[in-house]
Amino acid sequence: MSPCGRARRQTSRGAMAVLAWKFPRTRLPMGASALCVVVLCWLYIFPVYRLPNEKEIVQGVLQQGTAWRRNQTAARAFRKQMEDCCDPAHLFAMTKMNSPMGKSMWYDGEFLYSFTIDNSTYSLFPQATPFQLPLKKCAVVGNGGILKKSGCGRQIDEANFVMRCNLPPLSSEYTKDVGSKSQLVTANPSIIRQRFQNLLWSRKTFVDNMKIYNHSYIYMPAFSMKTGTEPSLRVYYTLSDVGANQTVLFANPNFLRSIGKFWKSRGIHAKRLSTGLFLVSAALGLCEEVAIYGFWPFSVNMHEQPISHHYYDNVLPFSGFHAMPEEFLQLWYLHKIGALRMQLERCEDTSLQPTS
């Protein structure tokens, strides 16, 4: 929790104490008392504050500048926080080691549904997290429109391990800006439903689309929502049946839940974190160095010129589901302290300073 948050709570408690001293107690109707308790609890959990608007955030970034120096101490400290809260080295994906036969687990996105690991699911898991840890130099690539005409493709592809979000297009028209290399790509079940009709009639189209990701891991939240399990399993079987180069990993719901709690404790209150923040969180726990690209959820770039929402289209997300400005401010803070590097300018215009 931020110092400001603590101060607000202490102030509000002090104010209530003063009011209690000045005014005699009165008996309230039971319904009114219950309502007061609910309101006070809500304000305690979610203290009232005003998030800066888009223009204020952009102006703040411009004033602070994007100059950056790696801070190994800050990076190690945050990696330790990730290890302590969420253990990505062991819990990033479902494995035979962390999800043994017969284990009962809860969907992290639903409170009413659980599932039990049986032979049909256990056989789909790798023995352990299939990465040689720690990963050295990682690039996490979001899909923000700020990547368009960025010239960042070569810099992204220089990373040892590249993570991408939501099966993004990597055709030749984009590679100069976003690169072509991938080691891990996320795929939300909603994409499988909407773009590939749940793989009921378009298995070949799906397999052909996956070829662009070469030997990547396809990381899917099969056990976040009950409705996501079936399409995720279909992806596994489809790629397995044709001997595709890609390997499906299922996100561990305990890991996703822990990441959600971690960021909620730091002020991000959203129905669900974005895929990008989940990936950055994992990278900060798995990688020695982290650089992120395309994490800019605003309608203008650093020169206050209009940009599209994604580098490949301008389709806006559903309002209120993610807390993108809050997420950005948290990542921007990590950039400023040197724990990760956030690329916001054209790559050829950026000169990195040496490690401190």
From Swiss-Prot:
One of its GO terms (molecular function) is alpha-N-acetylneuraminate alpha-2,8-sialyltransferase activity. One of its GO terms (biological process) is protein glycosylation. CMP-N-acetyl-beta-neuraminate binds at N143, N166, S274, T275, G276, W296, H310. It is an enzyme of class 2 (transferase). Its main location: Golgi. Residues 1-29 are cytoplasmic. It is a single-pass type II membrane protein. Glycans are attached at N71, N119, N214, N245. It comes from the Eukaryota. The chain crosses the membrane at residues 30-48. Disulfide bonds join C138-C287, C152-C347. InterPro entries: Glyco_trans_29 (IPR001675), Glycosyltr_29_Sialyltrsf (IPR050943), GT29-like_sf (IPR038578), Sialyl_trans (IPR012163). GO terms for cellular component: Golgi membrane. Keywords: Disulfide bond, Glycoprotein, Glycosyltransferase, Golgi apparatus, Lipid biosynthesis, Lipid metabolism, Membrane, Signal-anchor, Sphingolipid metabolism, Transferase, Transmembrane, Transmembrane helix. CDD domains: GT29_ST8SIA1 (cd23989). The active site is at H322 (proton donor/acceptor). Its EC number is 2.4.3.8. The keyword Repeat does not apply. Residues 49-356 are lumenal. Gene3D superfamilies: Glycosyl transferase family 29 (3.90.1480.20). Pathway: Protein modification; protein glycosylation; Lipid metabolism; sphingolipid metabolism. It is found in: Golgi apparatus membrane. It catalyses: an N-acetyl-alpha-neuraminyl-(2->3)-beta-D-galactosyl derivative + CMP-N-acetyl-beta-neuraminate = an N-acetyl-alpha-neuraminyl-(2->8)-N-acetyl-alpha-neuraminyl-(2->3)-beta-D-galactosyl derivative + CMP + H(+); a ganglioside GM3 (d18:1(4E)) + CMP-N-acetyl-beta-neuraminate = a ganglioside GD3 (d18:1(4E)) + CMP + H(+); a ganglioside GD3 (d18:1(4E)) + CMP-N-acetyl-beta-neuraminate = a ganglioside GT3 (d18:1(4E)) + CMP + H(+); a ganglioside GD1a (d18:1(4E)) + CMP-N-acetyl-beta-neuraminate = a ganglioside GT1a (d18:1(4E)) + CMP + H(+). Belongs to the glycosyltransferase 29 family. Catalyzes the addition of sialic acid in alpha 2,8-linkage to the sialic acid moiety of the ganglioside GM3 to form ganglioside GD3; gangliosides are a subfamily of complex glycosphingolipds that contain one or more residues of sialic acid. Can catalyze the addition of a second alpha-2,8- sialic acid to GD3 to form GT3. Can use GM1b, GD1a and GT1b as acceptor substrates to synthesize GD1c, GT1a and GQ1b respectively. This is Alpha-N-acetylneuraminide alpha-2,8-sialyltransferase.
